[in-house]
Amino acid sequence: MRSIQRRLSVGLFAVLLVVGLVLAQTGLWLFDQGLRRYFAGNLREEAENLLVAMVRGPNGMQLDEQRLNPAFQRPYSGRYFVIELEKDTWRSRSLWDSELEVPHKKGLVQGLVDGPEEQRLLVFRGHYKRMGQKLRIVVAQDYTPILESFARVQWMGLGAGALALLLVLLLQRLTVRRSLRPLEEVRLQIAQLQQGQRSQLDNQAPEELEPLVEQINHLLAHTEETLKRSRNALGNLGHALKTPLAVLVSLAEREEMARQPELQQVLREQLEQIQQRLGRELGKARLVGEALPGAHFDCAEELPSLCDTLRLIHGPHLQVSWSAPPGLRLPWDREDLLEMLGNLLDNACKWADSEVRLTVAQGEGMVRLKVDDDGPGILPDQRQAVLERGTRLDEQVSGHGLGLGIARDIAEACGGRLSLEDSPLGGLRVSVELPLQKSGRAARA
């Protein structure tokens, strides 16, 4: 059970149910005991009235029926008595042919006694002395109507308690939902962080959530600062190595080295491998994958300037176009996507005759990037080799052969894949599929 609201509801239901049942049963028990004490007083008065009804007769003591309560005369009326003397016993006519169990102790009997017609009797026994003779008077009253009333009250109480419990649970559910609303706001803000619509969470949060919000904002700032330092360090490393490598390349091309062609060729190959390996590893090290807050890739903002730059580099004869859904923002790091698309478009421009086309589409939980050119293309059996580190099929084309490899590394860092296909333009199509499940849905501006 992971839902906080469900846990609170179940816990509150259990507590209220137990407390309600205990309170209800305790209340009924206390009320029952109070009623029994009240009836005990009435039964004592009845016993004393019966004692007064014992008068002297011709043959000794006798019961004056004129003084009896009429209920003692009706059969099974619920009011009974038994008077015991040493030699005589008087029973109320209401007992008819039934017997009344005489308790062994005087006073109110603990519990109820079985009576006629399945009645439950409250019984009182008193010891008295009249006219020099000892008497034992047992008086009983039917307690069944009281028990039936208690049962009705219990069922009514259970019904009312159930309704009250449901009402309390409903109010508690509304209260908890309202209390947890700040968490929903934090969740929405985190989703906005993923979509690049904000750089940090709002500091105005409930007191209980302030430490969490502060830690998340601190983590975001620390992550962004760490990434900036890492990128700066990698950039500095790349610049620092360029000069020594340029010196070594220059030395390899000197006339002195031309006199030793084998050594010169080995030196060239090793230097080129160093440049390839350095460029690829630096490119892999700086990958971010999912974007930092506020660093998403806005297609409408980034792609026009990227295409204009490529036209300036490769000449006005080349038509570089792009298409994307209006307002589409991709939930990956801006620098990573710029580098990936820059490499793919630059590679396409080098091989294209007159046209390069970039298509961005979204659907089925994926973002698809397609770069098409009208160049010579690549044979299917050679496409895997092109994706290998630093491989170039034509040494006449400038570059170190790193573009497709770096683009594939970036695609994999974003959880996607890169593939080579035939282009409708007649050349090569480089297709990149990036899943939205890992980074959240692409945002529309």
Swiss-Prot record:
Modified residues (Phosphohistidine): 239
SMART domains: HATPase_c (SM00387)
EC number: 2.7.13.3
Gene3D superfamilies for this protein: 1.10.287.130, Histidine kinase-like ATPase, C-terminal domain
UniProt keyword annotation of ATP-binding present: yes
InterPro entries on file: HAMP_dom, HATPase_C_sf, His_kinase_dom, HisK_dim/P_sf, Sig_transdc_His_kin-like_C, TCS_sensor_his_kinase
Record flagged with keyword Transmembrane helix: yes
Protein's UniProt name: Sensor protein kinase CarS
Source species of the chain: Pseudomonas aeruginosa (strain ATCC 15692 / DSM 22644 / CIP 104116 / JCM 14847 / LMG 12228 / 1C / PRS 101 / PAO1)
Classification of source organism: Bacteria, Pseudomonadati, Pseudomonadota, Gammaproteobacteria, Pseudomonadales
Gene: carS
